[in-house]
Design a protein with these regions (language model features):
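Helicase motor core with emphasis on the C-terminal RecA-like subdomain
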Residues: 1-137, 142-145, 170-173
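Non-catalytic terminal extensions of ATP-dependent helicases
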Residues: 35, 42, 65, 108-223
């Protein structure tokens, strides 16, 4: 994800944007990385002093810093109209949070991008946050269910805008703009291939590794 972010910022070096990360440690690491590559960047998280948070926020609002790297502590009450992109380098815990944070891009009505970089370890981080919270078990279960929906969003082939609208109980046509709508890859039914793999594993009594299974399926004569 670091490589993607660096390449993206190089292509959009004159644009203002927000990069969200799930932990203070990750915010500070990303900020150091971007400064090392000479990007105009500020950071925001709850561990900074009130004065430092205010300064960094103002630097971003008045375009003295083009990019803000932040936890979800940043954004409430912020109305910066010319944000051209919002990148989530870590998956949020709920689709509501993602929708709210991604919606900080393009408030001036001009074309903008919302990008989610999905990594399994970030889902595990969200699991940790839920477990460490002082919520009761019923509330924790609801949070796990919301995280599951967020994971479904990250993996769906449906129009992303439709997915969000459906989640909030609304209907709408495909947007024609999201990465799924613009994906030109051809869908392929792999049911038969999957059945062959599972059958081979079963016939080999589930005792051999994936390399030998692959050799058998490809007709290799290796003994």
């Amino acid at each position: 994800s670091d490589r993607f972010i660096l390449d993206y910022l190089k292509l959009n070096s004159d644009q203002s944007g927000i990069i969200y990360a799930s932990t203070r440690k990750e915010v500070e690491r990303l900020t150091r990385l971007l400064k090392k590559h000479h990007f105009s960047v500020a950071m925001y998280h709850g561990g900074l002093s009130k004065e430092q948070r205010r300064k960094n926020q103002d630097d971003f609002l008045y375009d003295r810093s083009l990019v803000m790297v932040a936890t979800n502590a940043f954004g409430m009450g912020i109305n910066k109209s010319n944000v051209r992109f919002v990148i989530h380098d870590s998956v949020p815990g709920t689709l509501e949070a993602y929708y709210q944070e991604a919606g900080r891009a393009g408030r001036d009505g001009l074309p903008s991008e919302a990008i989610l970089i999905f990594k399994l370890k970030d889902v595990q981080t969200q699991h940790f946050f839920i477990e460490q919270s002082d919520r009761d078990e019923q509330s924790k279960q609801r949070e796990y269910e919301k995280l599951q929906i967020m994971t479904q969003y990250a993996n769906t082939q449906q129009c992303l805008q439709q997915f969000i609208l459906n989640y909030f109980g609304e209907d709408g046509p495909k947007c024609g703009r999201c990465s799924n709508c613009l994906d030109t890859r051809e869908a392929r039914d792999i049911t038969v291939d999957t059945q062959k793999v599972l059958s081979c594993v079963y016939r080999m009594n589930e005792r051999f590794g994936k390399n030998l299974v692959a050799q058998v399926l490809s007709g290799s004569q290796v003994k």
